[in-house]
């Protein structure tokens, strides 16, 4: 009998916008749906966390001083709900069963997050999209991804981004940037390394949860990673 695999995939909100830089690009939704469908076909249980940066970022909204940081973060949480509903529609259009669970109660749109209910959905082959972050300001959607992964007992978190992994410095600015295939949690928390915020990585470290950073636009990438091929991405784990 094949061993059950359960993963949490984190998508950035900006990635949904494509070249537009804002809003939601339908072609990207369709691509995400096709990639997730392949995982479900291979008996992999999938949870998803999506950012809201294609609509608004709490930190950016609060920069001018008019909007408080807490209110900015609340606005960001609502943005993730918009994205979660969009992903739900795309996944359902591809024939998958999907549930959106929000950390903030909004019964007209989605379920309220309950850990045990989320686990049951996953066991039944449904995709669960976790929205509204942790429900608290000052916590990123990266931290949300790690938290939900720990709660649902996921085997790994895959951070699907617009780049193929982690570098020792910004490859867009430095031609000599070195690609890092494997990092420890402590290395991932160094100032020059941009994987996730320190709160997220510390939580992953405490729970020995691997984090894989990969290019979300590489067809078949998610399935390859879960099946053990991490040659074209970066993985953060215990040494």
UniProtKB/Swiss-Prot annotation:
UniProt-listed SUPFAM superfamilies: Carbamate kinase-like
Positions of ATP binding: 10-13, 53, 57, 161, 167, 170
Protein family (similarity comment): Belongs to the UMP kinase family.
Any one GO MF annotation of this record: UMP kinase activity
Reactions catalysed according to its record: UMP + ATP = UDP + ADP
Localisation per UniProt entry: Cytoplasm
Keyword set, alphabetical order: Allosteric enzyme, ATP-binding, Cytoplasm, Kinase, Nucleotide-binding, Pyrimidine biosynthesis, Transferase
Binding residues annotated for UMP, in chain numbering: 52, 73, 134-141
Subunit structure: Homohexamer.
Superkingdom in the source lineage: Bacteria
GO CC annotation: cytosol
Keyword Nucleotide-binding in record: yes
EC number: 2.7.4.22
Name by which UniProt lists this protein: Uridylate kinase
């Amino acid at each position: 009998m094949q061993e059950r695999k359960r993963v949490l995939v984190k998508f950035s909100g900006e990635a949904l916008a494509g070249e537009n830089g804002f809003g939601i690009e339908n072609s990207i939704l369709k691509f995400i749906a096709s990639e997730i469908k392949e995982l479900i076909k291979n008996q992999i249980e999938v949870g998803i966390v999506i950012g809201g940066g294609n609509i608004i970022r709490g930190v950016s909204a609060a920069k001018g001083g008019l909007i408080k940081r807490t209110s900015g973060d609340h606005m960001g949480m609502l943005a993730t709900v918009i994205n979660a509903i969009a992903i739900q529609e795309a996944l359902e259009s591809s024939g998958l069963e999907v549930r959106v669970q929000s950390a903030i109660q909004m019964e007209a749109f989605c379920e309220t997050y309950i850990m045990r209910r989320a686990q049951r959905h996953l066991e039944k082959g449904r995709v669960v999209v976790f929205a509204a972050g942790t429900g608290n300001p000052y916590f990123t959607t990266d931290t949300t991804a790690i938290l939900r992964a720990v709660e649902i007992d996921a085997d790994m978190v895959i951070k699907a981004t617009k780049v193929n992994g982690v570098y020792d410095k910004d490859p867009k600015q430095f031609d000599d940037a070195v690609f890092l295939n494997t990092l420890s949690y402590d290395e991932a928390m160094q100032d020059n390394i941009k994987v996730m915020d320190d709160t997220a990585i510390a939580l992953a470290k405490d729970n020995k949860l691997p984090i894989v950073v990969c290019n979300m636009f590489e067809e078949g990438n998610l399935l390859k990673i879960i099946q053990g091929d991490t040659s074209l991405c970066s993985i953060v784990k215990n040494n």
